[in-house]
Amino acid sequence: MSELTALTIAEARDKLKAKAITATELTDAYLSAIDAANDAINAYVAVTHDQARSMAKASDERIAKGEAGALEGIPLGVKDLFATKGVHTQACSHILDGFKPEYESTVTANLWADGAVMLGKLNMDEFAMGSSNETSYYGPVKNPWRAKGSNADLVPGGSSGGSAAAVAAHLCAGATATDTGGSIRQPAAFTGTVGIKPTYGRVSRWGTVAFASSLDQAGPIARDVRDAAILMKSMASLDLKDTTSVDLPVPDYEAALGRSVKGMKIGIPREYRVDGMPGEIEELWQKGIQYLKDAGAEIVDISLPHTKYALPAYYIVAPAEASSNLARYDGVRYGLRVPGKDIADMYEQTRAAGFGKEVKRRIMIGTYVLSAGYYDAYYLRAQKVRTLIKKDFEDVFAKGVDAILTPATPSAAFSLADEVLANDPVKMYLNDIFTVTVNMAGLPGIAVPAGLNGQGLPLGLQLIGRPFEEETLFQAAHVIEQAAGRFTPAKWW
């Protein structure tokens, strides 16, 4: 069965089309793999055995009739942030206990319309708040990668840790994920997978539990660049139910792969050389520069002067929006309800019991920066900084730069239950140092594995593109992937 789960989406698609395998066989292979591995990795919070089998059966019938969709019979995992009709959707929070939506998110509806099969819901940081998948009510996810000669558990990154771990461990062919400040790109880098955060407005947010509405964007995590391009084509669409959705035709992203990058101008931002950055990250960055140079790209030094303000500004804007978005969870209509002596007490008790520590911390920060005395000093100033960050990118792109190459993360995956990070949230927030600018500016960004560190752990590079030019990112990422190769963890689970 493991040879079936080793197939990429592109390979499985071809075999299904040629009737060399059936969707039912493929789905059963993944369900068996999940049942065998999930206790160890904890990537799934709900496995939809019956639904997966009936969707696979329907796929086989459509293939037999010659009516196959673009993702016909491909088994996918869904981050627990996407509404799935009649299926567990709890954003990995206690406050949404037992919630099963009566509607489907636009992203998942698009995937099912193209014939994909749902294997289940994937673990994540609670309400997508975290960089290590340790804030989930359902416990942490373990990274399928381990350092050479070590049995120590590592984090898969966050918040889409379940998505990245499931893809890396071959527990799904691909997965949906979301990115508010790096939640697709950082876990992809930590697990040797590919993750793309599309331009804001490219993929509908409808039916996705909101964290920070002006920053959130859904995208895929996949095993390679081609698979990410295939998934992205199905996920992206115009959606009138999302007022930020953009009416632009969805290109065939897969067709961009293999196109030459000759003459493409790649910017290298000097501000991304941060103090204390490990030598192996700098080395990897240089390697990526060389890969693109060898393929004919032109490398130019650029400056993004407001980069240093991005992280503090992000950790004002995102919690502010979260404090507003999470005000709706009160125990009245759905989810957890803790009785109280009156309605105000019931709200208080429910929210105290329902939200985890990190979510409470961010709600409190958000409420504080939006309060009358501090709104101008914090929130308004952060929004001004955001405008300056966006302008930095616009200026660089106006000079003819096609894409920007940076590291994806400041380190490889770190230890699960790291005490220093547990006691110092700011140190944990620094994981997003290379990724938040992309969300603040609403740009597309892709993380692609580019090598292993001295301990044998994957490291990723990030490419940042012009708005709605994801094709350029796929094109350049494919060049790096071809040069660096693909990486799969040694099985310990």
From Swiss-Prot:
Catalytic reaction(s) noted: L-glutamyl-tRNA(Gln) + L-glutamine + ATP + H2O = L-glutaminyl-tRNA(Gln) + L-glutamate + ADP + phosphate + H(+)
GO MF term (any one): ATP binding
Keywords attached to this entry: ATP-binding, Ligase, Nucleotide-binding, Protein biosynthesis
Superkingdom to which the source organism belongs: Bacteria
Biological process annotations from GO: translation
EC number of this enzyme: 6.3.5.7
Pfam hit, one: Amidase
Annotated GO CC locations: glutamyl-tRNA(Gln) amidotransferase complex
This protein's record includes keyword Signal: no
Residues annotated as the enzyme's active site: 79 (charge relay system), 159 (charge relay system), 183 (acyl-ester intermediate)
Function: Allows the formation of correctly charged Gln-tRNA(Gln) through the transamidation of misacylated Glu-tRNA(Gln) in organisms which lack glutaminyl-tRNA synthetase. The reaction takes place in the presence of glutamine and ATP through an activated gamma-phospho-Glu-tRNA(Gln).
Family indicated by similarity: Belongs to the amidase family. GatA subfamily.
Quaternary structure and interacting proteins, as annotated: Heterotrimer of A, B and C subunits.
NCBIfam families with a match to the protein in the record: gatA
Protein name in the entry: Glutamyl-tRNA(Gln) amidotransferase subunit A
Native species: Brucella melitensis biotype 1 (strain ATCC 23456 / CCUG 17765 / NCTC 10094 / 16M)
